[in-house]
Curated annotation (Swiss-Prot):
Organism expressing this protein natively: Dendroaspis jamesoni kaimosae (Eastern Jameson's mamba)
Molecular-function annotations in GO: toxin activity
An annotated GO cellular component: extracellular region
InterPro entries: Snake_toxin-like_sf (IPR045860), Toxin/TOLIP (IPR035076)
Main location: secreted
Disulphide linkage map: 3-24, 6-11, 17-39, 43-55, 56-61
Protein name (database record): Toxin S6C6
Length: 63
């Protein structure tokens, strides 16, 4: 699985996930306004006034 991850210049860098990491995730902390993209082992989608998380399982789906 390949996912996007964040770097200094934004969240468009590609990374190859480990065998344990089955999901790509995109998270947004609405309080700090920080984004995080990357590979995760488990993922539960969430959307509240302060936090957003989207999970997916296909290559580069977490744009």
């Amino acid at each position: 699985l390949e996912c996007y991850r964040c770097g200094v210049s934004g969240c468009h860098l590609r990374t190859t996930c480990s065998a344990k990491e089955k999901f790509c995730a995109k998270q947004h902390n609405r309080i700090s306004t920080l984004w995080w993209h990357g590979c995760v082992e488990t993922c539960t989608e969430d959307e509240t006034w302060k936090f957003y998380r989207k999970c997916c399982t296909t290559n580069l789906c977490n744009i």
